[in-house]
Curated annotation (Swiss-Prot):
Residues at which GTP binds: 24-31, 67-71, 126-129
Localization (cell): Golgi apparatus; Membrane
Chief localisation class: Golgi
UniProt membrane topology term: Lipid-anchor
Functional note: GTP-binding protein that functions as an allosteric activator of the cholera toxin catalytic subunit, an ADP-ribosyltransferase. Involved in protein trafficking; may modulate vesicle budding and uncoating within the Golgi apparatus. Part of the ciliary targeting complex containing Rab11, ASAP1, Rabin8/RAB3IP, RAB11FIP3 and ARF4, which direct preciliary vesicle trafficking to mother centriole and ciliogenesis initiation.
Lipid group attachment sites (N-myristoyl glycine): G2
Residues found modified as Phosphoserine: S147
Protein name: ADP-ribosylation factor 4
Amino acid sequence: MGLTISSLFSRLFGKKQMRILMVGLDAAGKTTILYKLKLGEIVTTIPTIGFNVETVEYKNICFTVWDVGGQDRIRPLWKHYFQNTQGLIFVVDSNDRERIQEVADELQKMLLVDELRDAVLLLFANKQDLPNAMAISEMTDKLGLQSLRNRTWYVQATCATQGTGLYEGLDWLSNELSKR
């Protein structure tokens, strides 16, 4: 009986725990996003070798965000972070037109992985403040997102250094994950 009341109390008033995996190619802005969400400020970053993990509390949800390095030699290690992932944040440098096909290939590989079949997908179209940044519609097209079936996804325009779009993305993520 005590356990039942305790679990009910925690469901009503406690924070829901969510495991989020944040990936993307190198220099897309993953670590900048993580620490902007965590600390509310921009921190000086260096290329991530391995991972950073932080807890971000937002709207009564406690997101455990795993930021994994994106250099090509590190990407094979991404699979070690897939288990129990409820939300996948894929960060894309909207200004990097030369590597958009590489982004599409990596994203499609991940979406075929069985361990991620139930994870919702949030794409942060980062660096929207740059003059040649791809529009959301162009990025959606180049990444082939319209053809995704049986996958809940959303693209959010962001600028990590200014913080724009980040909380809107978390809003979408928290709304989708709270339905589960």
